[in-house]
């Protein structure tokens, strides 16, 4: 077993799900920060656990051909990116392997990840969320902490996001507005939230620990000057003592409280709390892949759980006979219904409720969809949702996931219910980070 504070020479064999290099030292797995596959290096052990250890590279004897100089001055301090020290080819390899390993090791499935789709790696995020620290700094958190790093320019965000962050900094400095302190639960400013559509228009929301801010008109003016294509500025009230960003009530300070975007040839109205994929171009690839995996011919009934603002629902509605969407966020369901009306899609229905309760209710009422599509949050599906979905006896289940581990766990649960994975693909929705989207098609095996 490796000892803490000792240095060992080791070769990196692969990657963890977070992008750490993996080596074996004295028979134990060691996870090495910013080490690349194939590298021969000296590793300083920082922490030793029962079944693994953590370390960092102190010298590279044989560098990987995939190593590159990070292109961001904040890399290593800001927790936003994980892979800026490796080239794109190796990043895509690591991500595809992450999905493949999870499906095999956790899910017990022999399905192969048939492709990994990728696109533009810079300035792709259409939604940005900047926390504000107690001392009024605006930036992003250090990895696995709530320690704020005052990042001024980010390679992942679109230009309006950086401009809005600069404007908020000027507002804080000019009017001495206190940031929120998570320990004392005092202070006002919690987060800056901005969403930008394909036309370059932005909706800005400032999240506060209270009902109002001092000098609101002046703040709005600063934000509009910095981001001229702003369609609206909204104040979000969040007085909950949790790490949640959104929640509570919203008050429009100026302009509109929604943003409209085009995706897959459809128009979508988006309120602040509506779920919407952050990478527009790769979202289109993701939804086309899900549509392909659904195998629709025009007559099927589809149940879309976790439908958000109805994006996948309406994409599938153009190829199905009837589509039912369910989502727990009321504002998202309102957006979904309005989006269907705007797009002239009449073969969709939307229900607001928890996925477990909605799925159980549909199963009890005898709904028999041909296809069920699920796109859950990172925690995946509850066993109740898996069980209810299986009771409806669909021919196919399309699982869209943002976490390979919970996807694989649920694939194993579905196998116990008689559904096996037959196709899988990965979509690089978040270049530069360890996050990866994936799509799996499951079919009845018994």
Question: Language-model features: where?
Answer:
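Short, conserved phosphate/pyrophosphate- and ester-handling motifs at nucleotide-, phospho-/glycolipid
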Residues: 38, 157, 279
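Short, aliphatic-rich beta-strand segments
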Residues: 194, 200-209, 267-271
């Amino acid at each position: 077993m490796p000892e803490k504070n000792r240095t060992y020479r080791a070769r990196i064999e692969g990657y963890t799900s977070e992008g750490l290099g993996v080596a074996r030292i004295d028979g134990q797995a060691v996870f090495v920060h910013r080490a690349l596959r194939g590298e021969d290096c000296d590793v300083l052990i920082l922490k030793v656990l029962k079944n693994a250890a953590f370390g960092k590279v102190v010298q590279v004897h044989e560098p990987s051909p995939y190593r590159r100089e990070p292109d961001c001055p904040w890399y290593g301090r800001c927790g936003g990116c994980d892979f800026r020290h490796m080239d794109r080819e190796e990043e895509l390899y690591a991500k595809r392997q992450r999905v493949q390993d999870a499906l095999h090791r956790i899910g017990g499935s022999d399905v192969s990840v048939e492709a990994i789709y990728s696109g533009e790696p810079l300035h792709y995020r259409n939604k940005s969320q900047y926390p504000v620290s107690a001392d009024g700094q605006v930036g992003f958190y250090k990895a696995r902490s709530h320690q704020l790093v005052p990042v001024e320019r980010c390679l992942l965000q679109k230009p309006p996001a950086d401009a809005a962050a600069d404007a908020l900094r000027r507002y804080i400095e000019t009017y001495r507005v206190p940031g929120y302190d998570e320990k004392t639960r005092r202070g006002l400013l919690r987060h800056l939230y901005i969403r930008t559509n394909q036309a370059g228009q932005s909706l800005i929301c400032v999240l506060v620990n209270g009902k109002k801010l001092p000098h609101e008109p002046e703040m709005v003016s600063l934000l509009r000057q910095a981001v001229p294509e702003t369609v609206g500025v909204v104040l979000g009230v969040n007085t909950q003592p949790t790490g949640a960003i959104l929640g509570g009530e919203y008050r429009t300070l100026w302009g509109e409280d929604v943003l409209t975007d085009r995706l897959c040839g459809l128009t979508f109205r988006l309120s602040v709390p509506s779920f919407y994929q952050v990478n527009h171009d790769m979202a289109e690839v993701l939804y086309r892949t899900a549509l392909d995996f659904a195998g629709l011919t025009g007559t099927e009934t589809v149940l879309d759980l976790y439908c958000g603002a109805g994006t996948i629902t309406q994409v599938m509605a153009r190829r199905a006979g009837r589509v039912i969407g369910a989502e727990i966020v009321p504002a998202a369901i309102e957006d979904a219904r309005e989006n269907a009306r705007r797009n002239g899609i009449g073969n969709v229905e939307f229900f607001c409720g928890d996925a477990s309760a909605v799925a159980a209710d549909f199963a009890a009422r005898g709904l028999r969809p041909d296809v069920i599509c699920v796109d859950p949050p990172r925690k995946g599906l509850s066993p109740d949702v898996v069980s209810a979905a299986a009771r409806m006896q669909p021919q196919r289940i399309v699982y869209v996931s943002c976490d390979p581990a919970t996807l694989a766990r649920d694939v194993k649960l579905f196998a116990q219910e008689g559904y096996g994975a037959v196709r899988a693909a990965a979509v690089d929705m978040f270049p530069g980070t360890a996050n990866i989207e994936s799509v799996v098609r499951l079919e009845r095996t018994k």
